[in-house]
From Swiss-Prot:
Belongs to the class-I aminoacyl-tRNA synthetase family. A motif ('HIGH' region) lies at residues 26-36. Its cofactor is Zn(2+). This is Cysteine--tRNA ligase. One of its GO terms (molecular function) is zinc ion binding.
C-alpha cells in the first residue's frame, strides 16, 4: 500500500505486516456531525483494506472527555462531566454502528490517562521545555528546533492563527496543564490537561513506539497535530508517526461545517432520512483528502448506486452478509475483490474502486441474463459480493429488508394485512378490489411485486 503523507506530500510505501493506527476521535459534548462521520468512515475503509489483505492492525480512536466545551455544557445543563460524556460516547458509538464502522481495538478516554499526561509534562519540564504562567503550564515552542515542521507553516502564518489571551513567551506556545481547583492533584498544582497533551499521552501508553499512521481531519493538522508531534519529539524522544493522513472538510453550501459555526449537520439528522449504509456510501464516494460538499441530491444518487448492489443481491437471493472478524483476515478469493484492493492500495483511490464496482454489478447482471440457471456463476457472484461488502463496509443487509427501510412497525403490519386481502381477492377473481389495494399502497409509496413465492413489497424512495 502507498499513502500520501500530509507532511512530505509524497506517497510512502507501507509494506509491514503489523500496522499501528491512531485516529483522533470526537470531543464528547454533543452529537456527532457529518465531519466526524466522514473521518471515521474514511479511515475505517483504510483499516478494512489492510485487514482484507492479511495485515494485523492495531487501531485506536480516542475520546476527548475533558475540555472547555464540556465544562461549558456542564454549566448550561447542570449535569456532571461523567453524565455528559457517557451520554455522548454512547450516542457516537450508536452512530458508528449504524455506519458499519468497525469497533476500534482501543477507545482511550483522556480522563483515564491523567497520570500518563503528568508523566509527560514532567519529562518536558526536566528538559527545559516548559514554563509557568498564572493560568497553567506552557510548552515553549522556541526550544523545539523542529516546531512547525509538520504543518510546514512559517512563523507569520502561525501567529495569525493564535490568540494572545495570556502573556506567553511566544505566540505559538500552548498549554500543557490548566490550573483548575475543581480537578486533578499534581505537583504542578490542581488542574486538568491541555488538549494537545491528551493525545500524546494516550498514544505513548497504548503503542509505546512510533505510529505507522496518525489520522484525522485536515483542521487538526495545525495546531493540534503540530503540537502533538512537538511534545512527542521533545518528551518521548521519538517521532510520533511515520505517515500522517488527513481527510478533507465536510462543507455545507461551500462553508466548512463545524459546531462553532452553528452549521453542523448531525449524523442522526441524516439517518432520519437515509439508512446508514447509504450515508456511508455517500461519504466514501469522494477521495478522503478532497473537501466534501454536502448535497441532498448527491446523497440520493449515492443511494441509487447502492440500490444496484442490493438489486443484484436480491436477484441471487443472497441474504444478510456477516462482517468479518477484525482478528482474522477474510481470505480474498474473487478476482474483482483483488482488483479493487489493488486500486485501494493506491492511497485509497475510492472513486476508481467504486466505478469498478459499478461495472462489476452491470457485468454480473448481463451474465445472469445469459445463464440464469448457472449455479457456479451464481455462487461466484455471491462470494464476490460478500467479499466486497466486507472491504467497503456496505451491502450487509438482507435485500428485501433493505428495500423496505423507513417503514414503521405499524405501517408494516397494515401493508401485510392489505397484501393478504389482495391475495384473497385475487383468489376470488375480484380483480377490481385487488387493483384498488395495489393503488392504495402505491399512493403511500409502496409497490407490490408478485413472485412465484408470493407477493413482496418495497418502499418507493424516488
Amino acid at each position: 500500500m502507498r499513502l500520501l503523507d500530509s507532511v512530505t506530500k509524497e506517497k510512502i510505501k507501507l509494506d509491514k505486516k503489523d500496522i499501528s493506527i491512531y485516529l483522533c476521535g470526537p470531543t464528547v459534548y454533543d452529537d456527532a456531525h457529518l465531519g466526524h462521520a466522514r473521518s471515521s468512515v474514511c479511515f475505517d475503509l483504510l483499516r478494512r483494506v489492510l485487514l482484507a489483505q492479511g495485515n494485523r492492525v492495531k487501531f485506536a480512536r480516542n475520546y476527548t472527555d475533558i475540555d472547555d466545551k464540556i465544562l461549558k455544557k456542564m454549566a448550561q445543563s447542570g449535569q456532571t462531566l461523567e453524565e455528559i460524556t457517557e451520554f455522548y460516547i454512547k450516542s457516537y458509538e450508536e452512530d458508528m454502528r449504524v455506519l458499519n464502522v468497525l469497533d476500534p481495538d482501543f477507545k482511550p478516554r483522556a480522563t483515564h490517562y491523567i497520570t500518563a499526561m503528568l508523566d509527560l509534562i514532567k519529562k518536558l519540564a526536566k528538559d527545559g521545555f516548559v514554563y509557568t504562567l498564572e493560568d497553567g503550564i506552557y510548552f515553549d515552542t522556541s526550544k523545539d528546533e523542529k516546531y512547525l515542521s509538520l504543518s510546514n507553516r512559517n512563523l507569520e502564518e502561525n501567529i495569525s492563527r493564535l490568540s494572545n489571551e495570556v502573556q506567553k513567551r511566544n505566540e505559538s506556545d500552548f498549554v500543557l496543564w490548566k490550573f483548575d481547583e475543581n480537578f486533578y492533584e499534581s505537583e504542578f498544582g490542581k488542574g486538568r490537561p491541555g488538549w494537545h497533551t491528551e493525545c500524546v499521552a494516550m498514544i505513548d501508553s497504548i503503542f509505546e513506539n512510533t505510529l505507522d499512521i496518525h489520522a484525522g481531519g485536515i483542521d487538526l493538522l495545525f495546531p493540534h497535530h503540530e503540537n502533538e508531534a512537538a511534545q512527542c519529539r521533545c518528551g518521548c524522544k521519538r517521532k510520533l508517526a511515520n505517515i500522517w493522513l488527513h481527510n478533507g472538510f465536510v462543507k455545507i453550501d461551500g462553508e466548512k461545517m463545524s459546531k462553532s459555526l452553528n452549521n453542523s449537520f448531525f449524523i442522526k439528522d441524516a439517518l432520519k432520512e437515509f439508512m446508514g449504509e447509504a450515508l456511508r456510501f455517500y461519504l466514501l464516494s469522494s477521495h478522503y483528502r478532497s473537501h466534501f460538499n454536502y448535497s441532498l441530491s448527491d446523497l440520493e444518487n449515492a443511494k441509487k448506486r447502492l440500490d444496484k448492489f442490493y438489486r443484484l443481491k436480491k436477484r441471487l437471493d443472497l441474504g444478510e452478509i456477516s462482517d468479518f472478524d477484525v482478528l482474522n483476515d477474510i481470505g480474498i478469493k474473487s478476482e474483482i475483490a483483488k482488483q479493487i484492493l489493488e486500486i485501494l492500495n493506491d492511497d485509497l483511490n475510492v472513486s476508481k474502486a467504486l466505478a469498478l464496482l459499478d461495472d462489476f454489478i452491470s457485468s454480473a447482471n448481463l451474465e445472469l441474463d445469459k445463464e440464469s440457471k448457472n449455479k457456479i456463476l451464481k455462487q461466484n457472484i455471491k462470494e464476490a459480493l460478500s467479499e466486497l461488502a466486507k472491504i467497503f463496509g456496505f451491502g450487509f443487509m438482507d435485500a428485501t429488508l433493505y428495500f423496505q427501510w423507513g417503514v414503521s412497525k405499524e405501517e408494516r403490519e397494515e401493508i401485510e394485512k392489505l397484501i393478504l386481502e389482495r391475495t384473497e381477492a385475487k383468489k376470488n377473481k375480484d380483480f377490481n378490489t385487488a387493483d384498488a389495494i395495489r393503488e392504495q399502497l402505491n399512493s403511500k409509496k409502496i409497490t407490490l411485486l408478485d413472485t412465484p413465492n408470493g407477493t413482496i413489497w418495497e418502499k418507493i424512495n424516488a
